[in-house]
Amino acid sequence: MEVIHGRPYCCRELEGADILSNTFYSNGLHTPYETTIRPTASEDRYQELRQALPQCRLRWGADREYGGMLPVSLPEEHRPKCEPPRLMSKGHQHYGFGGEIWPKKLPIEQYYYLTQNKKSDLYGNDSLLPKPPNSTVGEICSSYPIEHPYHTHISRGAMFPAFTSPKDLYTGVKARTQQPFPPTLPTKTYDSTILKTRGNPYRYELLDLPTDSKKKALTWPGQSVYYDFPKCVEKNKPVFYPKPPKTFAPNSSVTPWDTMTSAKDANIQRNLERSHWLTSYTHDFTGLGPMSPLELDDYREKELAELTGQIGFDPQPQEKFHPSLKPPRPLDGRIARLIQNQRPLEATVQIPPSCPDCTPRVLCAFHTFIPSSAEMMAMNDHLLSGLTHKNQNIEDKIKEEQRLLSTYALPSSYESKDMGSLFDLHSLPKITDTKKSDDLYWRQLDVKPLPIARSKSNHYIDYEPHKSTYRDPYAMCLNPVRLSKSNILQNKTDMADLTFDNYLRKPEFLGTDIESSDETRPLLNWISRAGVPKHHTNFRDFKNSFSRSMAHKRLHNSIQEEQKDLRDKLQCGMRHQFYGHNSHYFYN
């Protein structure tokens, strides 16, 4: 078929010059005039110019058929002197159109670019190979990938995946360069040589067992794909049915087996492989809940172990952090502070001193050497609770006060008077305003002096109305009378009798020499709440007095309004549907 040198520009379909290969344009020997120019304008501009190009309308609806207005194709010996006009030509009859083929007895140009079929890049006809005189055919020997014919029914990967990396320190490329090989690196089997003569019943095998320094590392062939060689003149006949990759390699490697680039990445990949060896029971039940994420990057620790000379340092991946049970929120108040070993909260209220002459920082001359009633009460409380062996500081303080009393020189107005005479003469109340002058302070008032309290041994104070301190740890004092009547102010008492035994006597003998009548109230009657016993609290009775059922009953009785039926579907107010269910099912 003759090649017609022309451009089918009359056909409305695209010629598809953009999708042809470069061979169509580079071959100037066969088709010198069909090297079309690729459009350099944009696609939108190209469509706009194509629509604006005036085209003649084909007759009989021929624009919808395969074909177009083409020049008449005639042989060279029958070509007329003048070029005949273009005629309607039909293309390849891919689908029959039911009409008569017109024109007749003329060669028809095949338009392969109108369909999905690919046109030959070199020739205008259907010949795919050049003729032997025009080309030389040579045999090419190159490897090509080959697989088993039943490879589609054979799994490519192994059932248990392998994480072996060429960058691994123990099984990778670096481990293969070290001899002797580590125990983690597999080696090839020994070579066996079989010596047997045909027809000889005796079989002789020669086994070569190399030493560790001469062993070779085991390699898995066909990690990526198998290549086979075609049958050539200088090559042997290839194996037609190769073995599938699974029979050789456990699994195909993702990365190529090249030189190691990062030992740290290989160590992380090995730890990742070992982390998959942990069972679900070990991962979920550690005693402290599920296992935390593992620390996969321990390359620094392994380097330090290698520098220090440790052999076989390959620990299991450890957890990044160990979970710890968080203690529950402690109770509020006194119990919480006791659990946390903290000081219990106390009100910091400064109690005014019992003596008007004393200040919180400076004591008067009388209480500087003689202990106050509060100190006396503290000493007796410690004695009654059986903890006298822990009060060495109090004993040392009292002994020091006794020593000071023995060496203290009284003023001139008290030189020839003892404690009894001092109480008789100076028992009148004084003006306690210390901001006044000393003359006003020492001036006596014109009032009747108080009766003198005498020591009588036949008087007895009843202790029945008061609880014992041994059974009630919340009591403030042993005897309310003891706070208001101190034994240091007893009449006819010498200073030499003021010993440690007088301070630390038993409670039943401490107040027997003191009268409890209203007429014999002592001078130290300004102590606040001296004769009033403290209210005894019982936390256990308060706890047992609470009843949950009674509290619910009082709560329901306090609600006087009529209870609403939650089953009523009201359109106003709060909603009654929760999670698709009526609130009646959640009521109590």
UniProtKB/Swiss-Prot annotation:
Crosslinked positions for Glycyl lysine isopeptide (Lys-Gly) (interchain with G-Cter in SUMO2)?
K543
Primary location class: cytoplasm
Q: Which GO terms describe its cellular component?
A: centrosome; cytoplasm; motile cilium
Keyword Aminoacyl-tRNA synthetase appears in the UniProt entry: no
Q: Mind telling me which InterPro entries this protein's record contains?
A: SPMIP4 (IPR027886)
Residues bearing PTM Phosphotyrosine: Y441
Q: Which residues carry this modification: Phosphoserine?
A: S224, S406, S421, S427, S437, S457, S484, S516, S545
- According to UniProt, the name of this protein is Sperm-associated microtubule inner protein 4
Species of the source: Rattus norvegicus (Rat)
- Write the lineage as a comma-separated list: Eukaryota, Metazoa, Chordata, Craniata, Vertebrata
